[in-house]
Protein backbone atom coordinates (compact mmCIF):
# COMPACT_ATOMS: atom_id res chain seq x y z
CA UNK A 1 0.00 0.00 0.00
CA UNK A 2 1.26 3.48 -0.88
CA UNK A 3 1.76 5.51 2.30
CA UNK A 4 0.91 9.18 1.87
CA UNK A 5 1.39 11.94 4.40
CA UNK A 6 -0.37 15.22 4.88
CA UNK A 7 1.62 18.22 3.61
CA UNK A 8 1.02 21.66 5.12
CA UNK A 9 3.05 24.78 4.36
CA UNK A 10 2.05 27.87 6.33
CA UNK A 11 3.86 30.32 4.02
CA UNK A 12 4.75 29.05 0.55
CA UNK A 13 7.11 32.00 0.06
CA UNK A 14 9.28 30.69 2.91
CA UNK A 15 10.16 27.61 0.84
CA UNK A 16 13.59 27.51 -0.74
CA UNK A 17 13.61 27.13 -4.49
CA UNK A 18 16.34 25.80 -6.73
CA UNK A 19 17.44 27.39 -9.98
CA UNK A 20 15.25 26.08 -12.77
CA UNK A 21 15.68 26.83 -16.45
CA UNK A 22 18.28 29.51 -15.61
CA UNK A 23 15.82 32.35 -15.07
CA UNK A 24 13.49 31.25 -12.28
CA UNK A 25 13.36 29.31 -9.04
CA UNK A 26 11.28 26.21 -8.34
CA UNK A 27 10.30 24.87 -4.91
CA UNK A 28 8.53 21.49 -5.01
CA UNK A 29 5.72 21.49 -2.45
CA UNK A 30 4.21 18.05 -3.12
CA UNK A 31 4.86 15.16 -5.48
CA UNK A 32 2.97 11.91 -6.08
CA UNK A 33 2.53 9.90 -9.30
CA UNK A 34 -0.71 11.74 -10.03
CA UNK A 35 0.73 15.28 -9.81
CA UNK A 36 3.56 17.57 -8.80
CA UNK A 37 2.81 20.92 -7.15
CA UNK A 38 5.52 23.60 -7.14
CA UNK A 39 6.03 27.29 -6.49
CA UNK A 40 7.76 28.96 -9.44
CA UNK A 41 9.16 32.50 -9.36
CA UNK A 42 10.23 33.94 -12.71
CA UNK A 43 12.88 36.64 -12.36
CA UNK A 44 11.97 40.22 -13.37
CA UNK A 45 11.86 40.71 -17.14
CA UNK A 46 12.52 37.01 -17.82
CA UNK A 47 10.52 34.17 -19.36
CA UNK A 48 10.49 30.38 -19.48
CA UNK A 49 11.47 29.17 -22.95
CA UNK A 50 8.70 27.92 -25.27
CA UNK A 51 8.04 24.22 -24.74
CA UNK A 52 5.39 21.51 -24.77
CA UNK A 53 4.48 18.53 -22.63
CA UNK A 54 3.18 15.54 -24.58
CA UNK A 55 1.36 13.83 -21.68
CA UNK A 56 1.05 16.39 -18.91
CA UNK A 57 -1.33 19.24 -18.11
CA UNK A 58 0.15 22.45 -16.66
CA UNK A 59 -2.21 24.13 -14.18
CA UNK A 60 -1.11 27.68 -13.29
CA UNK A 61 -2.35 29.76 -10.33
CA UNK A 62 -0.78 33.24 -10.12
CA UNK A 63 0.06 34.22 -6.54
CA UNK A 64 2.08 37.44 -6.95
CA UNK A 65 3.36 39.74 -9.64
CA UNK A 66 2.11 40.08 -13.20
CA UNK A 67 2.75 37.67 -16.03
CA UNK A 68 1.28 36.14 -19.13
CA UNK A 69 1.33 32.78 -20.86
CA UNK A 70 1.78 32.84 -24.63
CA UNK A 71 0.39 29.68 -26.18
CA UNK A 72 -0.16 27.91 -29.49
CA UNK A 73 -2.18 24.74 -30.01
CA UNK A 74 -4.98 23.06 -31.92
CA UNK A 75 -7.38 25.87 -30.92
CA UNK A 76 -5.13 28.55 -32.44
CA UNK A 77 -2.82 30.80 -30.48
CA UNK A 78 -3.14 33.52 -27.90
CA UNK A 79 -2.09 35.09 -24.65
CA UNK A 80 -3.48 34.23 -21.23
CA UNK A 81 -3.09 37.23 -18.88
CA UNK A 82 -1.81 36.11 -15.46
CA UNK A 83 -2.28 38.88 -12.91
CA UNK A 84 -2.32 37.83 -9.25
CA UNK A 85 -5.11 35.26 -8.58
CA UNK A 86 -5.49 34.23 -12.26
CA UNK A 87 -5.76 30.58 -13.33
CA UNK A 88 -4.80 28.86 -16.60
CA UNK A 89 -5.04 25.16 -17.58
CA UNK A 90 -2.64 24.29 -20.41
CA UNK A 91 -3.44 20.98 -22.17
CA UNK A 92 -0.77 18.52 -23.30
CA UNK A 93 0.60 19.28 -26.76
CA UNK A 94 0.20 23.07 -26.51
CA UNK A 95 3.36 25.11 -26.95
CA UNK A 96 3.62 27.71 -24.21
CA UNK A 97 6.01 30.16 -22.59
CA UNK A 98 5.57 31.99 -19.30
CA UNK A 99 6.61 35.67 -19.27
CA UNK A 100 7.16 38.02 -16.35
CA UNK A 101 5.84 41.42 -17.47
CA UNK A 102 7.60 43.32 -14.66
CA UNK A 103 11.24 44.40 -14.81
CA UNK A 104 11.36 44.99 -11.04
CA UNK A 105 9.28 42.27 -9.34
CA UNK A 106 9.23 38.46 -9.64
CA UNK A 107 6.18 36.71 -11.08
CA UNK A 108 5.24 33.81 -8.80
CA UNK A 109 2.74 31.06 -9.45
CA UNK A 110 1.72 27.64 -8.23
CA UNK A 111 2.25 25.10 -11.01
CA UNK A 112 0.61 21.70 -10.93
CA UNK A 113 1.85 19.10 -13.42
CA UNK A 114 -0.73 16.34 -13.82
CA UNK A 115 -0.03 13.52 -14.14
CA UNK A 116 3.54 13.64 -12.83
CA UNK A 117 4.29 10.10 -14.00
CA UNK A 118 5.61 10.43 -17.53
CA UNK A 119 6.30 14.17 -17.18
CA UNK A 120 8.24 15.55 -20.11
CA UNK A 121 9.64 18.99 -21.01
CA UNK A 122 10.21 19.33 -24.75
CA UNK A 123 11.79 22.56 -25.95
CA UNK A 124 10.33 23.82 -29.20
CA UNK A 125 12.30 24.99 -32.22
CA UNK A 126 12.20 28.66 -31.31
CA UNK A 127 13.61 27.93 -27.83
What kind of feature is each model-predicted range?
Residues 56-84, 99:
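A short beta-strand-loop-beta hairpin characteristic of the jelly-roll/cupin
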Residues 39-40, 51, 57-63, 88:
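His/acidic/aromatic-lined binding-pocket segments of jelly-roll/cupin-type domains
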Residues 35, 44, 55-56, 94-95, ...:
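A generic "binding-loop/recognition-motif" signal
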Residues 47-49, 68, 86-88, 92-98:
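Histidine-centered metal-chelating micro-motifs
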Residues 81-84, 92-119:
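Ligand-binding loop in jelly-roll beta-barrel domains
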Residues 1-38, 49-50, 79-84, 88, ...:
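A short, N-terminal "cap"/entry segment at the start of jelly-roll beta-barrel domains
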Residues 33-34, 55, 74, 103-104:
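Short strand-connecting beta-turns/loops that link adjacent beta-strands
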Residues 50-52, 112:
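Intrinsically disordered, low-complexity cationic segments
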Amino acid sequence: MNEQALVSVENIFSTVGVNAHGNCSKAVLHQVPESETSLFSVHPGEKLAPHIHTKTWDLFIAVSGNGEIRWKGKDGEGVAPMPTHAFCAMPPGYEHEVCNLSVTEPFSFILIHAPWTGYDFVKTKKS
